[in-house]
Amino acid sequence: MVGSEVLEECGEKISKKESKKRAAKLEKLLRKQEREEATSSSLSLEEEDESCSSNYGDVTTNELQSAVEGKELTDVSNLVEEIVGSEVSIRGRLHKNRLVGTKLFVILRESGFTVQCVVEETRVGANMIKFVKQLSRESVVELIGVVSHPKKPLTGTTQQVEIHVRKMYCLSRSLPNLPLVVEDAARSESDIEKSGKDGKQAARVLQDTRLNNRVLDIRTPANQAIFRIQCQVQIAFREYLQSKGFLEIHTPKLIAGSSEGGSAVFRLDYKGQPACLAQSPQLHKQMAICGDMRRVFEVGPVFRAEDSFTHRHLCEFVGLDVEMEIRMHYSEIMDLVGELFPFIFTKIEERCPKELESVRKQYPFQSLKFLPQTLRLTFAEGIQMLKEAGEEVDPLGDLNTESERKLGQLVLEKYKTEFYMLHRYPSAVRPFYTMPYENDSNYSNSFDVFIRGEEIMSGAQRIHDPELLEKRARECGIDVKTISTYIDAFRYGAPPHGGFGVGLERVVMLLCALNNIRKTSLFPRDSQRLTP
């Protein structure tokens, strides 16, 4: 056809105009199909998110009040390679999270142990990612997922497996703005110093901030470990003493007058009568021995109205107290101490390796050096060592903090031990009920025990003669009437006896070489702190 271009398609001749018309129609049809597919895909995603909506969310109070049949939670500490492939349910705090592409990496923390959890959008939907992403740090969550091998070794968690999350629920939301971040509170001093050198100064959480917000502070791995170690010290203490025939007792903490006749007591009104909080179970321990209990111990609170605001003084602490009948000589008490504490130290090493490692990560320290046979020096020998080192000390006075530290260094250098005993102390620096040394009344049948150059306990043989006891009480300025029931206990016959007392917090502080006793007191009470 002249003036007209003819095309052939499938044997049919069509004009160019008709071809364009058909192409436009086809393109319109394709666009319609794309729109339908997009709509279908969108509906599919909505349906998917709708179907996944039961896999995440906040748990209601009613749900928390109801029992869940067959529910079993796995501790984060038990998430190990041996259970890779298993589906587990775990609970913990949201330590932190990080979004990388379509994957949300969540670090979950439980009692100082951490695990990486992976939430993938392709598996759980965008809405679940959004839900998890907006949860604030320290919120309590539960999740269900499969234990898997990570693609690369993990360095930011305690567990070397990861959880591929299927479901996650929030049991309790934390406030978004925290007074301290647990991650900051868990940072070691060396890491803080290193960050400064690298030009990225990390936050340092100060002691008062920690103690004012103790409920957050004790969530750090090191603090979790410290109080687990403390628990094991008590267990080992009880275990050893019970194996030696000791009976655990509980003495009153409300008493008339003053505990040991000292001024450092918390006085109070007791129904119109003057009273105080016991600064020692000493008197009642002795009365128990007079009641033929022979060997007793107590784990309980002790109150001291200390004015000292130092790294090692508290106004309330846990006392580990022992009293025992003496069969032959007061050295029997020292023999007991010399066996008891190495037993405790050994048990802690055996039972708390993970906890000790957690403490070391934040507060590096070397294991305590002690001898199989506990070193025992006289007070005079200790004074002589200090004098030979050029220290000026009173031969009949008590050792101050600096003298204790110096003597600890000298003992470590000479005897290769950080745990030792110093006995036969001057009578002038001992309580009124301490038995004088038979060969020289300037000294007494008493001793102190030291760890890493600091005194942790005092012990002695007690005076069991009522006349001598009255005499010593008057010499110390004590009103005998206020302790008459105590003295009367010895008028009915009393066996020779003695004992010792030690602060649990101080033992743990020195065992872990910590620089402040407040780190080993759950909610410390000192001369300036009564809360939280």
From Swiss-Prot:
What SUPFAM superfamilies is this protein classified in?
Answer: Class II aaRS and biotin synthetases (SSF55681), Nucleic acid-binding proteins (SSF50249)
- Offer one Pfam family short name for this entry: tRNA_anti-codon
UniProt keyword list: Aminoacyl-tRNA synthetase, ATP-binding, Coiled coil, Cytoplasm, DNA-binding, Ligase, Magnesium, Metal-binding, Nucleotide-binding, Protein biosynthesis
Q: Respond yes or no to whether keyword Nucleus is given for this record.
A: no
This protein's source sits in the domain of life called: Eukaryota
Which residues does UniProt call coiled coil?
Answer: 7-41
| Residues annotated as binding Mg(2+) 2 | 455, 458
The UniProt record gives the binding positions of Mg(2+) 3 as: 455
A GO molecular function assigned to this protein is: ATP binding
Its annotated compartments are: Cytoplasm, Cytosol
Any one GO CC term of this protein is: cytosol
Q: PROSITE patterns of this UniProt entry?
A: AA_TRNA_LIGASE_II (PS50862)
Catalysis: reaction(s): tRNA(Asp) + L-aspartate + ATP = L-aspartyl-tRNA(Asp) + AMP + diphosphate
| Family matches, as PANTHER family | ASPARTATE--TRNA LIGASE 1, CYTOPLASMIC (PTHR43450:SF8), ASPARTYL-TRNA SYNTHETASE (PTHR43450)
- Name the record gives this protein: Aspartate--tRNA ligase 1, cytoplasmic
